[in-house]
Amino acid sequence: MSTPSIVIASARTAVGSFNGAFANTPAHELGATVISAVLERAGVAAGEVNEVILGQVLPAGEGQNPARQAAMKAGVPQEATAWGMNQLCGSGLRAVALGMQQIATGDASIIVAGGMESMSMAPHCAHLAGGVKMGDFKMIDTMIKDGLTDAFYGYHMGTTAENVAKQWQLSRDEQDAFAVASQNKAEAAQKDGRFKDEIVPFIVKGRKGDITVDADEYIRHGATLDSMAKLRPAFDKEGTVTAGNASGLNDGAAAALLMSEAEASRRGIQPLGRIVSWATVGVDPKVMGTGPIPASRKALERAGWKIGDLDLVEANEAFAAQACAVNKDLGWDPSIVNVNGGAIAIGHPIGASGARILNTLLFEMKRRGARKGLATLCIGGGMGVAMCIESL
């Protein structure tokens, strides 16, 4: 499936820890920052953007259409539209696919697409329209309810990871080893400055002065198997999934500027890469973490590629269990997967992660001179999404 859509520029904020650096920063402010960054990196004026599409899973309490808020805060004129979409963890990558489709149909020539999320600012709420005459009432944690709980079986995403671990016979040791490797790779990448080009600094204003956030704060330096082994199972007393071999609760944003090949050629712009294909596929919600398996196969088929053609892969690490299952089933070379660590180390701001891994993939492909790459994520509710990228 060939399209005329190419990625001209990409950027992300650092990923913040839960109640960390971005604890009081609304998602649309993070989104505005990455929109501004990709416009600057591409040399495109805000007034030239046709539309902004941003994934977000937890918009409750942020006001009408946070994507529109982000766009206008970034200087995109009111004549250009903006909207948000929600495909849970796949939102950021699906937003890019939607932007690609807008360009492919001729409805737009320049799109900014990506994702943003503040898990820290997701509110607790209660339905009080009917009134509470007396006694206590229940508050709902919207982050847990809307972002992390399976709507069909009523259990946490961590339980779906336990299901995958059992089905794929993945031991605690295997999951912990995967998680430690992710942390160690991310630590090495951070110390080596490999994330600096993709991260745009964000200034957090405070009473004691401004703080510039320009480095991922969730990465655990010095992670070891011994420290990982001390953690208790988080979702099943007899289980294998822990806080250490699962991704975190995080805040962040990422975006890409998409343009038609004709428009890029007219402007004389050298793109980061071309979107060759994409796919999204449904699976059993009980094992939602396996979604990248059929989604990746379908995206590769549409691209006319084979797994062996891939130079780099960014496969989101919602849980070590599902990441190990994906790696085993697809059989790709593990040395090309998440070479700078994944979400277990960097973090998983759910609505932004799809754009974050695409961003990381594009910059690492450029750094290595890699030709073909694939980005993929599992999605709550039983889905997967994948995208094939080719350098130009």
From Swiss-Prot:
Membrane-spanning ranges: none
Catalysed transformations (reactions): 2 acetyl-CoA = acetoacetyl-CoA + CoA
Protein name: Acetyl-CoA acetyltransferase
Subunit structure: Homotetramer.
Subcellular location: Cytoplasm
Any one GO BP annotation for this protein: poly-hydroxybutyrate biosynthetic process
One Pfam family from the record: Thiolase_N
GO cellular component terms given for this protein: cytoplasm
Organism annotation: Shinella zoogloeoides (Crabtreella saccharophila)
This enzyme's EC code(s): 2.3.1.9
